[in-house]
């Protein structure tokens, strides 16, 4: 929205956007190449998987149910009265719903907001360079950066027998 827009105009436009996205969230949305196979490999190793998103809760759950049925154990999107990332609230909720401790969690993301979220939650983090932001934006967080799903899987599973 342009600077100086009246708050009521901004609110109406945002509400219209949210309705449109909820109705059209599948349009032009696909998993990145290699993601389904990597997730299957993690599930085969017994990993519990969760999604934490700043997208609205309903579309996030619809996307995950459509593209990854039965893969994720917890899916949390943006909801009223829950602070959005980089606040750690949704991460804590997800980790708790999985019956895990934050020290067992690995947060994977593709943006500076994700790096901040992991730091705020106090959990390990791996960032990926193929998503929302490029490598340069991710470097300041000091966590591993994966350039492919194969590299991400290797980072996640190193040390496993």
What are these regions (language model features)?
Residues 19, 40-43, 56-57, 61-161:
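Asp-based, Mg2+/Mn2+-dependent phosphohydrolase catalytic module
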